[in-house]
Every structure is written in C-alpha cells, then in structure tokens.
C-alpha cells in the first residue's frame, strides 16, 4: 500500500487505535492557518493493525506523542515493520528546503506521509493531524471509526520563535499544570517556553548549593495578591480565584503558600517539552526582582538596604564580589538542567537608588571607570554575558538591557510598548529580538472586545524604521502571562484561550494568509468544541449588541448576540451577579426606562463567563451651552506630577506643565509620572446620539456636560470603554482625566453607526 517509499524503516513497537462505527466527516478548520491546503477525495481511516514507520530513530518520541494524542480511542498493539508495502503512516526526515518547523503532509485513503527537515516539522505535522481529526478523539472510550480527509498540505512558520512565558513565581504551577500549558502550546504550534522561575514573591528552582532558596524562599505568607484573589472569588462568584489547598502548608502555626521544582522535576518537564518540539528557556531574573533570594541571603544586597524602594524591590549589590559569585553559581546549576543554548537573565525594572548610597557600588563604578549607576547595571549585564558565553550559553534579557553593550549573540525580549527604540536599536546591533509588547501580548491583562483583533493586527515588520536587514533579526513573537492575580490553572486557561490561538496565527501564518476577524472567530468554533471536550476553561467571546453606556430618548431594544453557539445568556437588573437561575435572555428586550443590566454567558456544562455590565440611559438631548466670548482651537491639558491610582486625586499633585492638544492624547513632552486633566468644549454639528470610545492604560474618566459619562478609572492595563450620550448641536463642556502607572496609552475616538472609529474631528475641540 505505500509503494513509493524508498527509505528503510526502523522496526519499533507502537500502539494504534480503532473503533467500530461509521467514520465522522468534519469541516477542515486548522489553526494556525496552513500555507497551502488542498482537499482531495476520500479519507484515511485510523484502524486496527495500523503500521507506523520513521526514517530515523530520533523520531521515536514524535511517534510516542502521536500515540498520546490518539490515546482516548480503543487501541491494540501492533508491530511496525520495515516492509514498505505494509506501512500506513510514515514520518521522514529529509531536506525539504524549508524553514525550521516546515513540513509536507499527504493523506490518501491508503496512507499518510509526512516529510520535514527537522524534528519540529514532524511535530507540526502531528499537530495538524490532530486538528484534522474530530474533536471527539479527546473523549475517553468513544466508539467510532476516526478518519482524516485526504489532503495535500505544505506548511511553514513565518517566525522561528513562537513563544509563551509563564510566571511561576507570583503563583506556583506544579508539574502537571506546566505540562498542561505545554500541551496547549503544542496544539497550536508554539515552540518556545519561557519559564519565569524567580522573582520577589517566590524562588521556584532548586539550587543545591544554596538550599535556603527553596527551603524558605519558595514559601510565603499570603500577600496582597493572594488576598485580592480570594476577595474576587467571593465578589465575582468565581472559584477560579481561590488559592489551591495543595499549594498551602502549615509551618509552626503559619499558613504558607508556595512550591518549587526539584532537579528531577525540571528534567522531566524539559523532556516532556522536547517531545512536543518545544525548547525551554529558564529565566532567573537579576539584578532586580531578586528579593526572594535576598531575604534568605541578605549579604547579596547592599549593606542595610533591603526591602522595597519607591517602585521596585532592592536589587543585589554588584559591588560585592561574593554577590557576583553567587549569581554565577546559580547559573551553573541552571545551565546543567536546561539544554537549550539560550537562558534569560531578566534585567528589567531595577531600582538603582541603593547603588548611589552603597560604598561598594561606588567603588565598583570608580574601579571599572564607569560614570553612573546606569552604567553599573550595564557592566553587570556584560559581566554575566561573558560568564554565559564561557559556559556555552547565550544571554536573553528584557529590553531594558538593549543599550548595555551586549554582543550580537544576545537576544532582546521587547516588552515595553512605550520603549519605541528597543526594536530598531537591537536589530541595528544585529541582536535577535522577541517581540512581546505588553499592549498586545500581556495575557494577564483584562480582555475586551478588541483583544483578539489587536493581536491579529500586530506585525513587527510594520515598523518603517527597520531596514530589510534589520527585519531579519526579528526572531518572532511571544505572549507573557504574569501571575500576580492568577492562582489557578482554570484562570490561566480563561486568560490565554483564545488569545493563544490568535498569537499562533500571527506567529505562523503570513499576513496575506491570515483570516479576517469574523472568519477567525468562525474557525474558532470547532476549536472551542475541542476545548469543551478537553474541559479547557476558555473565554467565551464577548457578547455583542451594546456599549458600556447606551443612550436612548423614548425606548430602546436590547439585541444581544454571542459568537459562540450553544450558550445561554442570563441577566439581572438589580446589580446582583447573574447565575443559572437568573432571567434567561431569549430574544429582544424592550425597555422604556433607565436600566442597569448584568449579563453572563454560560456554556452547556454550566461554567460561566465574566460578567458584562452595561447601562441604558433614557434622557433627552443635552442642551448646548452659550459660547464664551473667545474660544481657541484644541483642548487645554494640564500635566501633574502624579503617582496615584484614582483620577479624582490628580489635582492635589504639583503642576509640571500646560499644553494645548489637538486630540485627547498624551502630549509628546509628558513623561514619567503622569496625571493629566484635559478640559475644553466639544462642539457637535447636529442633534443626535453620539458614541465615544475611551482607551487608556492606566485610568481615565470622561465628563460631558458636568456629568460622569465614562468611568475607566483605576490602575489597569489597556482597557477601552464605549459610551453614548444624546447631545443637541453646539458646545458641550468636557473634561478627560488620566493617569499612568506604567503603560502610557490615552485615546478618545468617535464611533459611527457601523462601529468604525475615527479620531475626534479637530474642529469639534475648543478651549478658553
């Protein structure tokens, strides 16, 4: 049956799988989108006594992975023979002239053949086979015959680095949980696992030379993050925020949270990842974010300077030779545990005030002929890179180290969306760049209706400052998940799916091949079916049909749609949390009075989405005001030196500058600690209901006609709210307040009846 094979097969034993009812045909919906897929007639049926062959024994783990994928189908043991005529499925390594990870897959009614030029390409093909199979293969003991359609696929990734970072410090993930994340990564062809193993809140990797790091540094009393999670579990009726009991222990009457990975744990996880074609990049963050270690070994810090500074924790003391030796010893053990050549050393968010006061740091600055504490950090990073290179490793650092004089061997993780020079600077230095700007790829950030859309629109090549040569140094893209507010795997699932699938799409598919947003959501439906069977707590797509604030004059109709079929929508109007017993939305709702709704979507298994709250406001057109004697174009912006968490407090902070702006935005001159109060008038040309989108990172508020219309306040990641108000033609007083903790995004746009957004017309904005 497979007569064109010429490569000899290795004889192995394997498990194959079968069932006994008619084959199920399914629509082909593979994500990320293949480069080329041609559907042909017929189907390959997985049956008893299948025979699997490989061209090289290095592919045995891949065959084992395929067996795991098919493990929920009734199986029988078979022997794979070298007889070419008896092979049903064949995996071949060969020179396909493709990128790393590329593959060719042909399935016919008689056989499946896969050809790739490396192991990762074979794994990519196996992942495609999994998605070609019905979602029901994920169910234990289903009595069906499973098949995949006859297809011809040629496929290759756009980027070599398709990454995901998991923070294991703020909250800890056990071996099985890490493996679950790796399984989800593999399902969508992600191949780089960045493992954030240490931070101020916990040390998670066993270092035999320094046992206190895990004996005590891996455990903590409940902190603000934990208490906030537990409070949200109650407030939001959501068990995903509960602290797992299996990560809590009682020591001398104290309740401690934590955990860590032994050397054996790490070796097991690294092997598990390797089988799935995933490289593991450990991160031991330094010289900042090191308090978990400093708390156990205080001499690592500058003498008498341990704790928290203005923003971040006390860093290590690079003026002490013993501290440098400690760092090298830690990395020696890390290097032995992780075979991948790249290791991440952090380098981000270092508060250097201690170094200015430390005699040893000042002596180091003089000895090394440095001029500042900034140069002291750069010296430390370069010193660590030399140690990495001497041990056969290459250094990866967050984008704060991009100007630290690293070699072209180093790689830069560009995370700060506002650090616009990081990408062109690193690529000009011939350093590989992993693009993960927080505005797009911080998956711990709250999700809204724009999250997936923004990811799909991201393209690091779109920076017109980059030459073609510089673009060659863009290694790929990555999502990061920081776990301060994420105590359970169910919460992880909710935050990363479907955003992880959107990430895989831009990491793998060329821009011309990517589906549009509506088509992408359509293709997500079969993915969600698979997730349902796998009991993955994905985020249900946003309900559509309303804004945060909706205006009407006489009456209104609430028309909701959910992109995901098979769900039910429950709602309340008294401010309470909707449950499965709340009113069922089963069609249009007519309202004649101002009404506050809380909507919640439920899957067939009863698991809920987050709550969507919206207000429908009945009010006549707001009267315009009489124009003052003289008005000038634009709005007045006052910058306050503000470090707080609420817009109402901005006025109390000192004023640093005043500006006139042509839009609701951050003036170019405004940097650092930002509190803005933007005032003026909005002049609308006609009576009507106007719709405004207010996007900010962090908090913002919108006052119109002296009333709070948009409340986007508080410290948060980029969040957009859309609000409406009925306005008469003419001038309406407006005020926008905004503060920034760490992000720097402010934008207000006009939304038309089709949902399209445009910048507020400049001629509408006036000030006294």
What are these model-derived regions, one by one?
Residues 293, 298-299, 304-409, 416-425:
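Active-site neighborhood of glycoside hydrolase catalytic domains
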Residues 395-400, 405-410, 416-559:
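Flexible, acidic glycine-rich loops studded with aromatic residues
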């Amino acid at each position: 049956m497979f007569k064109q094979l010429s490569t000899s097969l290795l004889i192995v034993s394997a498990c194959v799988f079968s069932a006994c009812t008619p084959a199920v045909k399914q629509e082909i919906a593979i994500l990320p989108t293949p480069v080329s897929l041609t559907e042909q007639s017929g189907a390959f049926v997985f049956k008893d006594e299948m025979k699997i062959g490989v061209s090289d024994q290095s592919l045995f783990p891949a065959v084992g992975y395929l067996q795991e994928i098919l493990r929920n189908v009734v199986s029988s043991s078979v022997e794979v023979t070298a007889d070419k005529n008896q092979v049903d499925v064949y995996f071949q390594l060969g020179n396909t002239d493709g990128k790393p990870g590329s593959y060719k897959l042909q399935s016919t009614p008689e056989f499946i053949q896969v050809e790739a030029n490396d192991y990762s390409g074979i794994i990519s093909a196996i992942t495609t086979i999994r998605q070609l199979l019905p979602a029901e293969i994920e169910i234990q003991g289903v009595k069906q015959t499973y098949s995949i359609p006859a297809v011809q696929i040629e496929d290759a990734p756009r980027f070599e680095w398709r990454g995901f970072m998991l923070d294991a410090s703020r909250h800890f993930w056990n071996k099985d949980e890490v493996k679950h994340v790796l399984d989800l990564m593999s399902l969508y062809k992600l191949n780089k696992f960045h493992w954030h193993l240490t931070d101020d809140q916990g040390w998670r990797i066993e270092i035999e030379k320094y046992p206190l790091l895990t004996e005590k540094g891996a455990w903590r009393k409940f902190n603000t993050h934990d208490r906030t999670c537990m409070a949200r579990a109650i407030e939001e009726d959501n068990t995903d925020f509960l602290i797992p009991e299996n990560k809590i222990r009682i020591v001398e009457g104290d309740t401690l949270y934590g955990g860590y990975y032994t050397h054996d744990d790490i070796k097991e996880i690294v092997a598990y990842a390797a089988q799935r074609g995933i490289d593991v990049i450990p991160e031991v963050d330094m010289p900042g974010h090191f308090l978990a270690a400093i708390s156990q070994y205080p001499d690592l810090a500058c003498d008498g300077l341990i704790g928290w500074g203005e923003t971040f924790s006390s860093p290590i003391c690079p003026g002490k030779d013993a501290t440098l030796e400690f760092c090298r010893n830690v990395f020696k053990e890390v290097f032995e545990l992780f075979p991948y050549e790249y290791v991440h050393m952090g380098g981000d968010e270092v508060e250097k005030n201690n170094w200015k006061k430390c005699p040893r740091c000042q002596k180091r600055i003089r000895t090394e002929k440095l001029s500042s504490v900034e140069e002291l950090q750069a010296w430390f990073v370069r010193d660590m890179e030399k140690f990495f290179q001497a041990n056969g490793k290459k250094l990866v650092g967050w984008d704060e180290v991009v100007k630290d004089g690293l070699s072209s061997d180093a790689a830069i993780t560009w995370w700060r969306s506002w650090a616009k020079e990081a990408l062109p600077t690193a690529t000009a230095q011939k350093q590989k760049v992993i693009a993960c700007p927080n505005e797009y790829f911080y998956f711990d950030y709250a999700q809204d209706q724009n999250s997936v859309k923004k990811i799909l629109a991201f393209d690091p090549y779109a920076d017109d400052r980059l030459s073609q040569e510089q673009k060659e140094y863009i290694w790929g893209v990555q999502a990061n998940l920081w776990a301060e507010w994420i105590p359970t795997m169910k919460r992880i699932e909710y935050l990363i799916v479907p955003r992880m699938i959107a990430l895989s799409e831009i990491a793998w598919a060329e821009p011309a091949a990517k589906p549009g947003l509506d088509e992408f959501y359509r293709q997500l439906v079969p993915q969600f079916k698979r997730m349902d069977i796998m009991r993955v707590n994905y985020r249900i797509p946003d309900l559509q049909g309303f804004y945060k604030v909706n205006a009407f004059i006489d009456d209104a109709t609430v028309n909701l749609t959910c992109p995901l079929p098979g769900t039910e929508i429950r709602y309340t109007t008294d401010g309470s949390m909707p449950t499965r017993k709340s009113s069922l939305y089963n069609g249009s709702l007519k309202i004649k009075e101002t009404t506050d709704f809380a909507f919640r979507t439920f899957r067939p298994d009863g698991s809920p989405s987050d709550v969507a709250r919206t207000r429908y406001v009945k009010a006549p057109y707001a009267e315009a005001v009489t124009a003052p004697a003289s008005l000038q174009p634009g709005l007045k912006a006052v910058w306050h030196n503000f470090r707080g968490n609420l817009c109402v407090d901005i006025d109390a902070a000192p004023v640093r500058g005043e500006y006139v702006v042509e839009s609701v935005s951050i003036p170019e001159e405004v940097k650092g600690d930002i509190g803005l109060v933007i005032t003026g008038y909005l002049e609308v040309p006609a009576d009507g209901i106007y719709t405004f989108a207010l996007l900010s990172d962090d908090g913002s508020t919108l006052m119109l006609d002296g009333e709070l219309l948009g409340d986007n306040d508080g410290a948060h990641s980029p969040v957009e709210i859309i609000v409406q108000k009925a306005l008469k033609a003419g001038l309406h007083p407006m005020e926008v307040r905004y503060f920034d903790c760490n992000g720097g995004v402010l934008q207000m746009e006009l939304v038309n009846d089709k949902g399209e957004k445009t910048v507020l017309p400049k001629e509408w904005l006036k000030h006294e």
